Amino acid sequence: MKIITNLNKKHDYQFNVTTSNGFSINCRFKEVENIEYHNDTGMVVTVFNDYKKGIASTNDLSSASIEKTIAKAENISKNTQPDEYQGLPESNVTLSMSKNLGIFYPKDLKTDDMASIAKTCEEEAFNFDKRIVNSEGATFSAANNEHMILNTKEAFGSFKSTDYSLSCITLAEENKLMERDYWYSSARDYNKLETAKQIGIKAAKRTISRLGAKTISTRSCPVIFSPEMASSLIGSFLSAISGPAIYKKSSFLLEKLNQRIFPEFINIKEKPHLADGSGTKPYDCDGVLTIEKDIIQNGTLNTYLLDTYSSRKLNMKCTGNGVITNITMEPDLPCPSNLIETLEDGILITEMMGSGANILTGDYSRGAFGYLIKNGKIEHPVTEITVASNLLKMFENIKSIGNDFDLRNNIRTGSILIDNITIGGTT
């Protein structure tokens, strides 16, 4: 605190401090292949000097190192162009204390025990089917994290979190052709991870299901995006309503505020303080309190996602979105337990390649792997296909959300069924 009191009173300062310690164990063919321990600390110093901004960072939190980092940030600020929208957030929107968020579950874990769990995970995959012929191993990881923020407008906050995960990657072979897939579980609470057996078997099932993939002809048809792929679509939507995309006029959703983007049964909410949420945070990177909000209500876009800078640039209220926290899809219609059974003919997409979402135009084109659906059942896997459409059209054509919600990531959604998408095939 002595360093803080010795700062230049003509400037504003912000300090973001993060610490993380934990380990990762990879096991392959019943042997420990790699163990990594980490104990990381970092500080980012931001200086605002007459609307000029300077940033510097350090991994050394000694007094001497912090003083040097502050001086470096000050020097950088002197050589940047002034920007009237730069500066700390107003003091009335920043936090003074942090709440218990339900994301910190420390546990004393022994590396030998975790190695045994990883070995079991891989072994279950091999035992599931003789066509599982190889593996990239199973990996267990754990981390304890802490974040603190303070600035010279007397804002202060901190929170702790834990992260645990277990994953397995397998390879299957049939008729001299090989396929690769995986499964993983992640949680804030170790006790909420899927079991090693569940993860190993799911990895094996997913890999086996890819064998015998065929090419198909080009067509337009209904498409189901698996929860993992559906979250990617919603991620593109979030990018398009971010402050930078809006003030740079580089979004296909520019001037779409208060207009219907999705069908009326779609609601999308941000829940920053969700217990066990992978994106849970009490404040954003500027120190602004995060708040629950209805981003999409009855299909209508209610708000952009603005940090301090973009809100000033757009002359709009800051929404505390210097970070995206937990996003949840909450449809008003019942969620089918199995969207596949609702389709006479269509495609299930489980993997996409490349970054083919153009946020400026909304044009969407990505390579994909999936499964052909006939009469409510999967007929066979399909490969060498391309998903081509426009994001705005895709959002408008959402027909249903499945109840298979993926709770592992910060974007929580089930499978999404979208009508009339062009699938590019080989003929």
Task: Name the predicted role of every residue range.
Residues 1-281, 285, 297-300, 325, ...:
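Active-site bordering "gate/hinge" segments
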Residues 98, 256-427:
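Dual-mode signal for accessory low-complexity, basic/Gly-rich regions
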